[in-house]
From Swiss-Prot:
Keywords: Amidation, Cleavage on pair of basic residues, Disulfide bond, Hormone, Signal. InterPro entries: Neurhyp_horm (IPR000981), Neurhyp_horm_dom_sf (IPR036387), Neurohypophysial_hormone_CS (IPR022423). This is Oxytocin-neurophysin 1. GO terms for biological process: drinking behavior; eating behavior; female pregnancy; grooming behavior; heart development; male mating behavior; maternal aggressive behavior; maternal behavior. Neurophysin 1 specifically binds oxytocin. Interacts with oxytocin receptor (Ki=1.5 nM). Interacts with vasopressin V1aR/AVPR1A (Ki=37 nM), V1bR/AVPR1B (Ki=222 nM), and V2R/AVPR2 receptors (Ki=823 nM).
Amino acid sequence: MACPSLACCLLGLLALTSACYIQNCPLGGKRAVLDLDMRKCLPCGPGGKGRCFGPSICCADELGCFVGTAEALRCQEENYLPSPCQSGQKPCGSGGRCAATGICCSPDGCRTDPACDPESAFSER
């Protein structure tokens, strides 16, 4: 009598676990879900040509960066969205990303950075 009840308990526990069974495994295994690409940050600025880089920073290649202006107001909406986002092409500075030609932005602010200037990469030294 103890053996069937033990088997039922084990089957019940097995059903309640969040194991990755053959029929419901994500591609790449259980940990692959953590490696999903981040979404792009909200568009902002004139004509929606820019992307948010922080709660009050909007940057676009053609327009430069707007910090704390009306063009960057939409970026405050990012604080209320559940998933993280990422703007810019390549990393730069201390935790920032290239926002416009020669400008590196992080959520804290923007600064000039030669790593974000495509022409400085080809200039002679």
